């Protein structure tokens, strides 16, 4: 990222859970990314993030506290990059719909981790594996893509 550039808008799926809160804490003040959207269950949709979550990660970042939560639906989320903290029971289907809708999904779930066309990336070790995204997009017909971590 170029120094002085505007941080990219990102969304957090599963934002009210412990992993979602960790993503928010780690991204607070990040020079490349700005948490612009928080998404979780239907129960949290329409509520201010501060009211929808029981924050456990220290101080809730003020710029996220006032965000209005949405559902985990690509029609409700406009950010081009999505950090997914969804439980594996729902992550596979939801993350796939976001990738098909043109979003880059950075997933913490196991669902796509062993797929041969999905990069499992440890940035300090194998960032070059991101090149698999081209294969993934061609094979799956997605405009976006999914990248997993080793968790």
Which residues fall in each region the model found?
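N-terminal Rossmann-like NAD(P) cofactor-binding subdomain of oxidoreductases
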Residues: 1-151
């Amino acid at each position: 990222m170029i120094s002085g550039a505007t941080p990219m808008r990102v969304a957090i799926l599963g934002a009210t859970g412990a992993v979602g809160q960790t993503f928010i804490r780690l991204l607070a003040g990040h020079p490349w990314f700005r948490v612009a959207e928080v998404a979780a269950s239907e129960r949290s949709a329409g509520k201010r993030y501060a009211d929808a979550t029981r924050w456990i990660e220290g101080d809730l970042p003020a710029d996220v506290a006032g965000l209005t939560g949405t559902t985990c639906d690509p029609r409700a989320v406009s950010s081009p990059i999505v950090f997914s903290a969804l439980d594996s029971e729902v992550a596979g289907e939801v993350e796939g719909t976001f990738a098909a809708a043109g979003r880059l999904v950075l997933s913490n779930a196991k669902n796509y981790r062993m797929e041969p066309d999905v990069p499992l990336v440890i940035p300090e070790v194998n960032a070059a594996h991101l090149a698999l995204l081209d294969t993934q997009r061609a094979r799956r017909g997605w405009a976006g893509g999914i990248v997993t971590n080793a968790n």
